Amino acid sequence: MDARERLIVGLDVPTIGEAEKLVSTLGDDILFYKIGYQLVFAGGLEFARDLAASGKKIFLDMKLLDIDNTVASGVENIAKMGMSMLTLHAYPKAMKAAVEAAAGSGLCLLGVTVLTSMDAEDLADAGYSQDPHSLVLRRAGQARAAGMGGIVCSAAEAAEVREIVGPDMAIVTPGIRPTGSDHGDQKRVMTPFDALKAGATHLVVARPIVKAPDPRDAARAVLNEMVGALWPANR
Protein backbone atom coordinates (compact mmCIF):
# COMPACT_ATOMS: atom_id res chain seq x y z
CA MET A 1 0.00 0.00 0.00
CA ASP A 2 1.19 3.50 -0.77
CA ALA A 3 0.52 6.56 1.39
CA ARG A 4 -2.79 7.40 -0.32
CA GLU A 5 -4.16 3.97 0.57
CA ARG A 6 -3.13 4.40 4.20
CA LEU A 7 -4.42 7.92 4.93
CA ILE A 8 -8.06 8.08 6.06
CA VAL A 9 -9.53 11.58 6.21
CA GLY A 10 -12.24 11.99 8.82
CA LEU A 11 -15.27 13.77 7.40
CA ASP A 12 -16.04 15.33 10.78
CA VAL A 13 -18.39 18.00 9.45
CA PRO A 14 -22.08 18.61 10.28
CA THR A 15 -23.67 18.53 6.83
CA ILE A 16 -23.56 16.50 3.63
CA GLY A 17 -22.97 19.71 1.70
CA GLU A 18 -19.78 20.44 3.63
CA ALA A 19 -18.64 16.83 3.19
CA GLU A 20 -19.25 16.97 -0.54
CA LYS A 21 -17.31 20.23 -0.81
CA LEU A 22 -14.39 18.76 1.13
CA VAL A 23 -14.28 15.60 -0.99
CA SER A 24 -14.34 17.74 -4.13
CA THR A 25 -11.53 19.94 -2.79
CA LEU A 26 -9.32 16.97 -1.91
CA GLY A 27 -9.95 15.35 -5.28
CA ASP A 28 -7.83 12.38 -6.29
CA ASP A 29 -5.29 13.02 -3.53
CA ILE A 30 -7.52 11.22 -1.02
CA LEU A 31 -8.92 7.74 -1.57
CA PHE A 32 -10.18 6.85 1.92
CA TYR A 33 -12.72 8.63 4.14
CA LYS A 34 -14.06 8.08 7.65
CA ILE A 35 -17.72 8.78 8.32
CA GLY A 36 -18.91 8.85 11.93
CA TYR A 37 -21.99 9.67 13.97
CA GLN A 38 -22.12 13.37 13.14
CA LEU A 39 -22.47 12.83 9.41
CA VAL A 40 -24.38 9.53 9.62
CA PHE A 41 -27.20 11.26 11.48
CA ALA A 42 -27.29 13.99 8.82
CA GLY A 43 -27.99 11.53 6.01
CA GLY A 44 -24.48 10.19 5.80
CA LEU A 45 -25.29 6.56 5.07
CA GLU A 46 -26.61 7.36 1.61
CA PHE A 47 -23.65 9.68 1.10
CA ALA A 48 -21.33 6.84 2.14
CA ARG A 49 -22.92 4.55 -0.43
CA ASP A 50 -22.49 7.17 -3.13
CA LEU A 51 -18.84 7.75 -2.23
CA ALA A 52 -18.16 4.02 -2.28
CA ALA A 53 -19.87 3.72 -5.66
CA SER A 54 -17.61 6.49 -6.99
CA GLY A 55 -14.55 4.45 -6.11
CA LYS A 56 -13.65 5.86 -2.70
CA LYS A 57 -13.04 3.62 0.30
CA ILE A 58 -15.24 4.24 3.33
CA PHE A 59 -14.43 3.62 6.98
CA LEU A 60 -17.78 3.65 8.80
CA ASP A 61 -16.94 4.59 12.38
CA MET A 62 -20.01 3.41 14.30
CA LYS A 63 -18.32 1.81 17.33
CA LEU A 64 -21.11 -0.76 17.60
CA LEU A 65 -21.86 -2.44 20.92
CA ASP A 66 -25.03 -4.32 21.82
CA ILE A 67 -26.23 -7.86 22.42
CA ASP A 68 -24.77 -10.39 19.99
CA ASN A 69 -27.79 -10.79 17.73
CA THR A 70 -28.29 -7.05 17.37
CA VAL A 71 -24.64 -6.48 16.47
CA ALA A 72 -24.74 -9.35 13.97
CA SER A 73 -27.89 -8.01 12.31
CA GLY A 74 -26.40 -4.55 11.96
CA VAL A 75 -23.15 -5.88 10.54
CA GLU A 76 -24.98 -8.04 8.00
CA ASN A 77 -26.72 -4.97 6.59
CA ILE A 78 -23.62 -2.78 6.64
CA ALA A 79 -21.69 -5.52 4.83
CA LYS A 80 -24.08 -5.11 1.89
CA MET A 81 -23.37 -1.38 1.54
CA GLY A 82 -19.90 -1.59 0.01
CA MET A 83 -18.06 -0.17 3.01
CA SER A 84 -14.38 -1.03 3.50
CA MET A 85 -14.08 -0.78 7.30
CA LEU A 86 -16.44 -0.79 10.28
CA THR A 87 -15.69 -0.24 13.96
CA LEU A 88 -17.18 -1.92 17.00
CA HIS A 89 -16.07 -1.88 20.60
CA ALA A 90 -13.63 -4.68 21.35
CA TYR A 91 -15.85 -6.85 23.54
CA PRO A 92 -15.30 -10.56 22.81
CA LYS A 93 -18.91 -11.71 22.28
CA ALA A 94 -19.80 -8.74 20.10
CA MET A 95 -16.66 -9.21 18.01
CA LYS A 96 -17.28 -12.91 17.45
CA ALA A 97 -20.87 -12.25 16.39
CA ALA A 98 -19.74 -9.52 14.01
CA VAL A 99 -17.05 -11.69 12.43
CA GLU A 100 -19.57 -14.43 11.71
CA ALA A 101 -22.03 -11.91 10.25
CA ALA A 102 -19.43 -10.32 7.96
CA ALA A 103 -17.90 -13.57 6.72
CA GLY A 104 -17.20 -13.50 2.99
CA SER A 105 -18.24 -9.86 2.53
CA GLY A 106 -14.83 -8.22 2.32
CA LEU A 107 -15.75 -5.82 5.14
CA CYS A 108 -12.79 -5.26 7.48
CA LEU A 109 -13.98 -5.21 11.09
CA LEU A 110 -11.99 -3.09 13.52
CA GLY A 111 -12.07 -3.49 17.28
CA VAL A 112 -11.90 -0.19 19.16
CA THR A 113 -9.59 -0.62 22.15
CA VAL A 114 -9.38 2.64 24.11
CA LEU A 115 -10.34 6.04 22.69
CA THR A 116 -7.31 8.23 22.06
CA SER A 117 -9.07 11.05 23.93
CA MET A 118 -8.94 8.97 27.15
CA ASP A 119 -6.14 8.76 29.69
CA ALA A 120 -5.74 6.77 32.92
CA GLU A 121 -7.86 9.22 34.91
CA ASP A 122 -10.70 8.95 32.39
CA LEU A 123 -10.64 5.15 32.56
CA ALA A 124 -10.66 5.23 36.36
CA ASP A 125 -13.66 7.56 36.30
CA ALA A 126 -15.42 5.05 34.03
CA GLY A 127 -14.78 2.22 36.49
CA TYR A 128 -11.77 0.54 34.86
CA SER A 129 -8.87 -0.56 37.04
CA GLN A 130 -6.45 -0.95 34.13
CA ASP A 131 -4.40 1.84 32.60
CA PRO A 132 -4.96 2.62 28.88
CA HIS A 133 -1.82 0.82 27.75
CA SER A 134 -2.67 -2.46 29.49
CA LEU A 135 -6.29 -2.36 28.37
CA VAL A 136 -5.32 -1.73 24.75
CA LEU A 137 -3.00 -4.73 24.72
CA ARG A 138 -5.61 -6.96 26.33
CA ARG A 139 -8.29 -5.96 23.85
CA ALA A 140 -5.89 -6.36 20.93
CA GLY A 141 -5.39 -9.99 21.92
CA GLN A 142 -9.13 -10.48 22.23
CA ALA A 143 -9.68 -8.96 18.78
CA ARG A 144 -7.17 -11.33 17.25
CA ALA A 145 -8.79 -14.31 18.99
CA ALA A 146 -12.20 -13.26 17.64
CA GLY A 147 -10.91 -13.15 14.07
CA MET A 148 -11.22 -9.39 13.57
CA GLY A 149 -9.59 -7.71 10.59
CA GLY A 150 -7.85 -5.09 12.68
CA ILE A 151 -7.95 -2.83 15.70
CA VAL A 152 -8.08 0.86 16.48
CA CYS A 153 -5.53 2.12 18.98
CA SER A 154 -3.24 5.06 19.54
CA ALA A 155 0.07 5.01 17.71
CA ALA A 156 1.80 4.90 21.11
CA GLU A 157 0.68 1.28 21.49
CA ALA A 158 1.09 0.25 17.84
CA ALA A 159 4.48 -1.45 18.16
CA GLU A 160 3.44 -3.67 21.06
CA VAL A 161 0.05 -4.33 19.50
CA ARG A 162 1.78 -5.54 16.34
CA GLU A 163 3.66 -8.12 18.40
CA ILE A 164 0.36 -9.37 19.79
CA VAL A 165 -1.77 -9.45 16.64
CA GLY A 166 0.86 -10.60 14.15
CA PRO A 167 1.72 -9.23 10.70
CA ASP A 168 -1.64 -9.41 8.95
CA MET A 169 -4.12 -7.41 11.05
CA ALA A 170 -4.72 -3.75 10.29
CA ILE A 171 -3.73 -1.24 12.95
CA VAL A 172 -5.70 1.97 12.47
CA THR A 173 -4.52 4.93 14.51
CA PRO A 174 -6.47 8.13 15.20
CA GLY A 175 -4.95 10.92 17.25
CA ILE A 176 -2.55 11.73 14.41
CA ARG A 177 -1.18 15.25 14.43
CA PRO A 178 1.22 16.52 11.76
CA THR A 179 4.49 17.99 13.01
CA GLY A 180 3.85 21.33 14.72
CA SER A 181 0.05 21.09 14.86
CA ASP A 182 -2.22 21.54 17.88
CA HIS A 183 -3.29 18.40 19.78
CA GLY A 184 -6.88 19.58 20.28
CA ASP A 185 -8.87 17.15 22.46
CA GLN A 186 -6.52 14.23 21.80
CA LYS A 187 -4.34 13.05 24.68
CA ARG A 188 -2.31 10.23 23.09
CA VAL A 189 -1.00 11.59 19.80
CA MET A 190 1.82 10.98 17.32
CA THR A 191 3.03 12.39 14.01
CA PRO A 192 2.26 10.56 10.74
CA PHE A 193 5.92 9.61 10.29
CA ASP A 194 6.29 8.18 13.79
CA ALA A 195 2.93 6.37 13.70
CA LEU A 196 3.83 4.44 10.56
CA LYS A 197 7.27 3.65 11.94
CA ALA A 198 5.58 2.30 15.07
CA GLY A 199 3.59 -0.23 13.04
CA ALA A 200 0.32 1.49 12.11
CA THR A 201 -1.13 0.48 8.75
CA HIS A 202 -3.68 3.30 8.43
CA LEU A 203 -3.79 6.81 9.88
CA VAL A 204 -6.99 8.73 10.61
CA VAL A 205 -6.60 12.49 10.28
CA ALA A 206 -9.56 14.85 10.59
CA ARG A 207 -9.17 18.29 12.16
CA PRO A 208 -5.66 19.11 10.83
CA ILE A 209 -7.02 18.64 7.30
CA VAL A 210 -10.72 19.50 7.61
CA LYS A 211 -10.13 22.74 9.53
CA ALA A 212 -7.06 23.84 7.57
CA PRO A 213 -7.23 27.05 5.49
CA ASP A 214 -6.32 24.89 2.48
CA PRO A 215 -7.40 21.28 3.13
CA ARG A 216 -5.70 19.96 0.00
CA ASP A 217 -2.34 21.45 0.95
CA ALA A 218 -2.76 20.08 4.48
CA ALA A 219 -3.57 16.61 3.15
CA ARG A 220 -0.55 16.69 0.86
CA ALA A 221 1.67 17.68 3.77
CA VAL A 222 0.44 14.66 5.74
CA LEU A 223 0.98 12.40 2.73
CA ASN A 224 4.52 13.71 2.37
CA GLU A 225 5.27 12.88 6.02
CA MET A 226 3.89 9.40 5.42
CA VAL A 227 5.98 8.89 2.28
CA GLY A 228 9.05 9.69 4.35
CA ALA A 229 8.23 6.81 6.67
CA LEU A 230 7.33 4.39 3.88
CA TRP A 231 10.31 5.10 1.62
CA PRO A 232 12.56 1.98 1.62
CA ALA A 233 15.66 3.94 2.59
CA ASN A 234 13.99 4.95 5.85
CA ARG A 235 12.92 1.47 6.90
UniProtKB/Swiss-Prot annotation:
PROSITE patterns, sorted? OMPDECASE
**Similarity comment text for this entry:** Belongs to the OMP decarboxylase family. Type 1 subfamily.
Q: What is this protein called?
A: Orotidine 5'-phosphate decarboxylase
EC no.?
A: 4.1.1.23
Q: How does it assemble?
A: Homodimer.
Gene Ontology MF annotations: orotidine-5'-phosphate decarboxylase activity
Per its record, the protein catalyses: orotidine 5'-phosphate + H(+) = UMP + CO2
Specify the species.
Rhizobium leguminosarum bv. trifolii (strain WSM2304)
A single Gene Ontology CC term = cytosol
The task this protein performs is described as: Catalyzes the decarboxylation of orotidine 5'-monophosphate (OMP) to uridine 5'-monophosphate (UMP).
Which residues fall in a coiled-coil region?
A: none
Q: Which UniProt keywords apply?
A: Decarboxylase, Lyase, Pyrimidine biosynthesis
Top EC class of this enzyme: lyase
> What does the entry give for GO biological process?
'de novo' pyrimidine nucleobase biosynthetic process; 'de novo' UMP biosynthetic process
Q: Taxonomy-wise, where does this protein's organism fall, top ranks first?
A: Bacteria, Pseudomonadati, Pseudomonadota, Alphaproteobacteria, Hyphomicrobiales
Q: Which residues form the active site?
A: K63 (proton donor)
InterPro entries, sorted: Aldolase_TIM (IPR013785), OMPdecase (IPR014732), OMPdecase_AS (IPR018089), OMPdecase_bac (IPR047596), OMPdeCOase_dom (IPR001754), RibuloseP-bd_barrel (IPR011060)
Write down a Pfam family by its short name. Answer: OMPdecase
